[in-house]
């Protein structure tokens, strides 16, 4: 038997115990009753639904077993027990999709995220503009079929031609559109949000069937005469019609903004799970400063910030989700409970992932092998367990 003490939170951020007891096979035997004077935290393993890589490898640039495993392990050992593999705008993503599917099938990945290529050429960010184009339904269907049900979401600009048709096709395959990399006016974003929320396919999901890709980044800023898509995404999340991603690393977004959005959206019962923290991590996550690559574009990391070597646009993140929790909670932007909810229950709900998926623990269930993190009082990662096995 092994007892680990700490304030135990479930995936919704609710305090449910003061420690856990595991048997020799990593099976949960009991939750210790809530009590005072307990140090540290125990949370379910984190879920990252927007991650391009780490450890020197990326899913779009290294679609081979060695590269894929390196990226996965870099995040797993820091407590991300479930993750999507995010691609970028590519001329032909099929080889990368086909390389990732086996890793989904054996439970190392929760699915695949296509970030592009159906995005605004004016808001490429760190995407390759040569690969950006308007949606083609025959092409998209071929990608979805290659994904064998593992493509869970795709970033599309709401204003591009055939955006709604692409969204409907994604929903038909059980994937959700993620609006982003956009130059849309607020009215255009609202039209797409409403059309998707009211579609028959979306209604059958029983949950918000759309997300917003890294809110604020790669989209027009909130302005006093044209609020743009940012306001519409936030309001839709508060209504329970959308889920917004925040790259809560204190680089992509100021912590005060993370706090404001989390509080505003979460203040509505419909928006309780409306905010998701993501890393948008690239190959340099968990690595030293230096030169890397994202989607074939050179990237330079200086002081932990990744930027395109030419042009200087932010080119993904270098944090892991456990880093984001520490940064946001330590500076007071969120509570521990809010941060855990945004890293566990909210991402799982956004994509319809439940506790039967490998690496996913939402509630602590006696008799099951949990995936979890043991944090110190300072929110450093002390231990990581996945499916009842210690990996750190």
Name these PLM-found stretches.
Residues 52-54, 58, 68-94, 108-120, ...:
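Divalent metal-dependent hydrolysis catalytic cores, especially in the metallo-beta-lactamase
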Residues 71-72, 94-101, 140, 144, ...:
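Generic structural signal for well-ordered alpha-helices
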Residues 13-31:
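N-terminal helical capping/dimerization or prosegment-like subdomains
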Residues 9-18, 332-340, 349-387:
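Acidic, glycine-enriched loop/beta-strand segments at the rims
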């Amino acid at each position: 038997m092994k007892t680990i003490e700490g304030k135990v939170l479930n995936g919704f951020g609710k305090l449910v115990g003061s420690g856990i007891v595991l048997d020799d096979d990593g099976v949960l035997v009991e939750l210790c009753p809530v009590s005072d004077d307990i140090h540290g935290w125990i949370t379910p393993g984190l879920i990252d639904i927007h991650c391009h890589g780490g450890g020197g490898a990326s899913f779009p640039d290294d679609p081979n077993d060695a590269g894929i495993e390196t990226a996965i392990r870099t995040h797993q050992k820091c407590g991300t027990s479930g993750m999507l593999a995010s691609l970028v705008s590519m001329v032909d993503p099929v080889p990368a999709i086909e390389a990732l599917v086996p890793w989904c099938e054996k439970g190392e990945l929760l699915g695949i995220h296509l970030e592009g290529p159906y995005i605004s050429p004016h808001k490429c960010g760190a995407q390759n503009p040569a690969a950006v184009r308007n949606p083609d339904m025959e092409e998209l269907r071929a990608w979805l079929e290659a994904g064998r049900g593992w493509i869970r979401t795709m970033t599309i600009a709401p204003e591009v031609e055939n955006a709604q048709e692409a969204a409907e096709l994604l929903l038909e395959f059980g994937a959700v559109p993620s609006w982003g990399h956009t130059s849309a006016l607020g009215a255009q974003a609202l039209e797409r949000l409403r059309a998707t929320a009211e579609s028959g396919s979306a209604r059958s999901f029983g949950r918000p069937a759309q997300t917003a890709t890294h809110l604020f980044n790669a989209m027009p800023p909130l302005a006093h005469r044209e609020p743009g898509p940012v306001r519409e995404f936030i309001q839709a999340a508060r209504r329970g019609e959308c889920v917004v991603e925040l790259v809560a690393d204190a680089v992509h977004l100021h912590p005060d903004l993370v706090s404001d959005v989390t509080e505003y959206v979460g203040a509505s019962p419909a928006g309780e799970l409306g905010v998701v923290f993501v890393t948008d991590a690239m190959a340099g996550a968990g690595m030293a400063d230096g030169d890397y690559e994202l989607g074939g574009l050179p990237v330079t990391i200086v002081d932990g910030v990744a930027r395109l070597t030419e042009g200087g646009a932010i080119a993904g993140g270098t944090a892991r989700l456990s880093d984001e929790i520490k940064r946001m909670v330590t500076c007071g932007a969120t509570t521990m409970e809010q941060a855990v909810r945004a890293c566990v229950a909210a991402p799982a709900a956004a994509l319809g992932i439940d506790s039967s998926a490998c690496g996913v623990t939402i509630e602590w269930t006696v008799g099951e092998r949990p995936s979890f993190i043991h944090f110190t009082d300072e929110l450093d990662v002390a231990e990581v367990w996945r499916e009842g096995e210690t990996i750190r």
